[in-house]
Amino acid sequence: MSQTRDLQGGKAFGLLKAQQEERLDEINKQFLDDPKYSSDEDLPSKLEGFKEKYMEFDLNGNGDIDIMSLKRMLEKLGVPKTHLELKKLIGEVSSGSGETFSYPDFLRMMLGKRSAILKMILMYEEKAREKEKPTGPPAKKAISELP
């Protein structure tokens, strides 16, 4: 009955995310060295931003975004999609299996000329973050501003 409980689950998750970040950094270096993408402006900062987005939705750290992760991402952005639409989107992006897409697939899609829906999704997410509600009491209005 003496079971040992790991009370440091957050520490293990942090280590998992650190390992994932190292793997993604190696892939970013390959893209930085690739002459195909050398003409892109501000490539290092773009790759860093894409890495952060990818890590946000690859919660299990296995290196692939699956249908449920993509569904969660789209719902978070207020653009829910059906299961069939998600399968079609992943099939468009993925170079391997039809159920997931990897980080290199994600980068090729984002940096490629035929950027699809996910590029628009990331753009809309950035716009949504800019519109934060003002905090504190509302500003006083003059009588002329009242309806």
UniProtKB/Swiss-Prot annotation:
GO terms for molecular function: actin filament binding; calcium ion binding. Ca(2+) 2 binds at residues 100, 105. PANTHER family: ALLOGRAFT INFLAMMATORY FACTOR 1 (PTHR10356:SF4), ALLOGRAFT INFLAMMATORY FACTOR-1 (PTHR10356). It is found in: Cytoplasm, Cytoskeleton; Cell projection, Ruffle membrane; Cell projection, Phagocytic cup. It comes from the Eukaryota. The modification Phosphoserine is found at residue 39. The modification N6-acetyllysine is found at residue 11. GO terms for cellular component: actin filament; cytoplasm; cytosol; glial cell projection; lamellipodium; nucleus; perinuclear region of cytoplasm; phagocytic cup. Residues 45-80, 81-115 form the EF-hand domain. Homodimer (Potential). Monomer. Interacts with LCP1. The modification N-acetylserine is found at residue 2. Ca(2+) 1 binds at residues 58, 60, 62, 64. Keywords: Acetylation, Actin-binding, Calcium, Cell membrane, Cell projection, Cytoplasm, Cytoskeleton, Membrane, Metal-binding, Phosphoprotein, Repeat. Its main location: cytoplasm. Actin-binding protein that enhances membrane ruffling and RAC activation. Enhances the actin-bundling activity of LCP1. Binds calcium. Plays a role in RAC signaling and in phagocytosis. May play a role in macrophage activation and function. Promotes the proliferation of vascular smooth muscle cells and of T-lymphocytes. Enhances lymphocyte migration. Plays a role in vascular inflammation. Phosphorylated on serine residues. One of its GO terms (biological process) is positive regulation of T cell migration. It is a peripheral membrane protein. Residues 128-147 are annotated as: Disordered. This is Allograft inflammatory factor 1. Detected in T-lymphocytes and peripheral blood mononuclear cells.
